[in-house]
Amino acid sequence: MPVTAMCLQDSKKLKKAKLTRKKVTPFPFSRMVLCLSLVFTLYVEATNARCLRPRSKELLCGSELVDILQFICGPTGFYVSKGASFRNRNRPGIVEECCFCGCSVAILESYCAAPVTNFTGREEQKS
């Protein structure tokens, strides 16, 4: 077999090999929009899912939250737990409860500090 015939046969084999490759089709824009909208919807639903009970109408955030806590707790004051990492908390923080989900007076009262007691067990009066 002559060399030119071998080269022609090899080139035909290469052309066939090139033709058998799968073509990568571009991802259609409509599918990309659909996927992104699904991801966004899942994100929104996940953020709403952190409210385990139905949302109340009143959302309290920032200075409004502090003012209402001072009003409800009175002279005993209030506390916000510190140092607990997000994963180790057994209950959401006051901001998650009242600012994102809305909270009731009972939840606000649960953040009031306990009255200061002296060693006789009687409640001290603050002036």
From Swiss-Prot:
Q: Main location per UniProt?
A: secreted
Ranges where the record places region D: 114-121
Please name the InterPro entries in this protein's record. Insulin-like (IPR016179), Insulin-like_sf (IPR036438), Insulin_CS (IPR022353), Insulin_family (IPR022352)
Listed as disulfide-bonded, the cysteine pairs are C61-C99, C73-C112, C98-C103
| Region A, residue ranges | 93-113
Keywords (alphabetical) are: Developmental protein, Differentiation, Disulfide bond, Growth factor, Neurogenesis, Secreted, Signal
Report the leader peptide range.
1-49
Matches recorded under SMART domains: IlGF
Q: Please provide the Gene Ontology terms (biological process) for this protein.
A: generation of neurons; positive regulation of activated T cell proliferation; positive regulation of insulin receptor signaling pathway; positive regulation of MAPK cascade; positive regulation of transcription by RNA polymerase II; positive regulation of vascular endothelial cell proliferation; regulation of muscle cell differentiation
The propeptide sits at: 122-127
Q: Does the keyword Iron apply?
A: no
| Keyword Nucleotide-binding on entry | no
Q: Which Gene3D superfamilies match?
A: Insulin-like (1.10.100.10)
One GO location term (cellular component)? extracellular space
Q: Where in the cell is it found?
A: Secreted
Q: Where is this region: B?
A: 49-80
GO MF, any single term: protein serine/threonine kinase activator activity
Which residues does the annotated region (C) include? Answer: 81-92
- Enumerate the PANTHER family for this protein: INSULIN-LIKE GROWTH FACTOR II, INSULIN-LIKE GROWTH FACTOR III
Q: What does this protein do?
A: The insulin-like growth factors, isolated from plasma, are structurally and functionally related to insulin but have a much higher growth-promoting activity. Promotes anterior neural development.
Name of protein: Insulin-like growth factor 3.L
Q: What is the lineage of its organism?
A: Eukaryota, Metazoa, Chordata, Craniata, Vertebrata
Q: Which gene encodes it?
A: igf3.L
